[in-house]
Amino acid sequence: VGRVSGSLSLVEFPADDPARARRFWEGVLGVELDARTASEGQGWQTHAAGPAIGVHERGRGPGDSYSLPYFVVGDIGDALMRVRDLGGTVVHPGEQWAICKDSEGSPFGLARAPLAE
């Protein structure tokens, strides 16, 4: 069953020490963070039902200075246009996922529905 548009798909944590961060989140949540597929990007994440928790090495991606919630969208191009039209900014556009800021400057990510499943 696919996730509906607008649902939370991923919370991403940049880490100075990815191995330590993986141990932390695996221990806290009691789940494994697996290596991502090429389409998911660099790092590790949970692949269980519900929103994923992800970790990547700081300095290896556009969302490196803060934790990011990612939300599912059906069409990422349309979603990025809506972000701009509503006063937000697109920090890192993409076809699979994107990083944006809302009208108040808070960062968030968007993930195309198949990527988020």
What is each stretch, according to the model?
Residues 1-23, 50, 66-71, 112-117:
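N-terminal beta-strand motif that seeds the catalytic metal site of vicinal oxygen chelate
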Residues 8-16, 58-86, 96-101, 106:
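Vicinal oxygen chelate
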Residues 17-32, 83:
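Amphipathic alpha-helical segments
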Residues 21, 34, 77, 89-90, ...:
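Ligand-binding pocket scaffold of soluble enzyme catalytic domains
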Residues 30-37, 86-93:
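Short secondary-structure junctions
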Residues 31-66, 107-114:
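Conserved short beta-strand elements that form part of the metal-binding/catalytic scaffold
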Residues 50, 94-95:
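Residue-level signal for tight coil/turn positions that link beta-strands
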